[in-house]
Amino acid sequence: MSIVGIGTDLVEIGRLAALQQRYAVRFTERLLAPAEQAGYQASAHCDRKAAAFLARRFAAKEAAAKALGCGIGAQARLTELVVTHTTAGAPCLTMTGAARRQANRLGVRCAHLSISDERDHALAFVILER
């Protein structure tokens, strides 16, 4: 396999908390795919956990879009970049719609995702291989 794309993103958790407070449901619906909503709802009881959840997802999606070489927009919508976890807890990236088509154009066969967060920031790193 060879690497076709690498992307990383660093997000300030407080910025996502402010967006969530300002736009509420509209923001989460624009950011999260239906498969991600349950994870968000599980953390929604605590503002800090909810903001960290959203920041991790946003960082992962931005990193994935950068690895695809297109950024967030017509070729990769936020809800088309889906972050879930394996039963062991490892993060997984799935692409649908236009994001999947962009990945297919690049010949992507495998996506590797790493996500981390600390008190104030969330970080994600994506490697795409063909």
Positions of PLM-derived features:
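Core catalytic alpha/beta fold that binds nucleotide/phospho-ligands
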Residues: 1-130
